Amino acid sequence: MVKINSNWITITRLKSLFLFLGFLLCSMGAKADHVMGSDMGYQCLGGGKYKLIIKFYRDCRGASAPPSWSLLYWYAGNNQGQSTSRYSISMSRVGIRDITPRCSTASSPCSPQNTSYTGDGVEEHTYEANIDISKSPFTGVGLGTTYCDLTFAYNQCCRNAAITTGATWADFWTTATINVCNVNKMKVKCNTSPQLSNVPVGYACCNQA
């Protein structure tokens, strides 16, 4: 008669379960955790038309970035509040560039471009879309004094582990606000947001101030 140790079977099954859960968690982590930062601005095109511009900074150790975003939030009010709505708009990617700080002779750690888990590097992904704030659903914004601030917002998952200003794995939100009342008071009725002249510093040298 063969004696089977039930305790040994239980321990073996538990080990298998823990290994499976560990693999599952690692797989989940590998699919996200790639957002290092982003900024959002707008360019006036005239006649109430604007180009929205999103610059998304991807950690090349994480997942690849999508070719477009199709969901954008907007809300109108004073002091960036009130009347939140969803507005479906296609933010198409118009460019990708490697902004990893490195020696000129060093190869790119983000090669191939926009490929998951390639190395310790940073990519800048630029997304754009045109809107007309004189037409629906923005009709009426800025005509009085109640709804002056038109704020656009989008989110992307997930924040990477290197970010210390908030929880890792949480959604990363970015906003841009147009004060339509102030624009309407201008002679040219047109305003463009400030543009950053330098790319963000993703990595700093040891002992660098």
Model-derived features: where do they sit?
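Long, compositionally biased, intrinsically disordered segments
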Residues: 31-209
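Bacterial N-terminal signal peptides
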Residues: 15-27
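Generic signature of intrinsically disordered, low-complexity, basic-rich segments
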Residues: 12, 26-28, 125
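Bacterial N-terminal signal peptides that target proteins for export
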Residues: 2-18
